[in-house]
């Protein structure tokens, strides 16, 4: 049973990794922003830093590229603004947790 769990976790990790790379490579917005500003590509945005102005500029983590996660913030004046930060999506966190758990058990 443990072997099946490890194989399934490995497959989920590999599929998530390859799909995140494939989706990022195919996004037209990212391609246009990279072509328009070569320096942005070289200077990525670290985890937990603001990415409101450059939603495709997040750095890579240990296994996956961080994703720009946005939320709507309401100021005291009642004005709504969008604030974004680079972070790890929940399904990537789960995959990293499974891989870390596997490393602890099997070395």
Swiss-Prot record:
GO terms of molecular function: toxin activity
Main location, first listed in the record: secreted
Compartments, record wording: Secreted
Pfam families attached to this UniProt entry: Toxin_35 (PF10530)
Keywords, ordered alphabetically: Disulfide bond, Knottin, Secreted, Signal, Toxin
Disulphide-bonded residues: 44-59, 51-68, 58-86, 70-84
Keyword Disulfide bond: yes
Entry-linked InterPro entries: Spider_toxin_CSTX_knottin, Spider_toxin_CSTX_Knottin_CS
Transmembrane annotation, as ranges: none
Keyword Magnesium belongs to the record: no
GO CC annotation: extracellular region
Annotated tissue distribution: Expressed by the venom gland.
Signal peptide: 1-20
Residue ranges of the propeptide: 21-41
Family: Belongs to the neurotoxin 19 (CSTX) family. 04 (U1-Lctx) subfamily.
Domain notes: The presence of a 'disulfide through disulfide knot' structurally defines this protein as a knottin.
Protein's name according to its UniProt entry: U1-lycotoxin-Ls1l
Organism from which the protein derives: Lycosa singoriensis (Wolf spider)
Source taxonomy: Eukaryota, Metazoa, Ecdysozoa, Arthropoda, Chelicerata
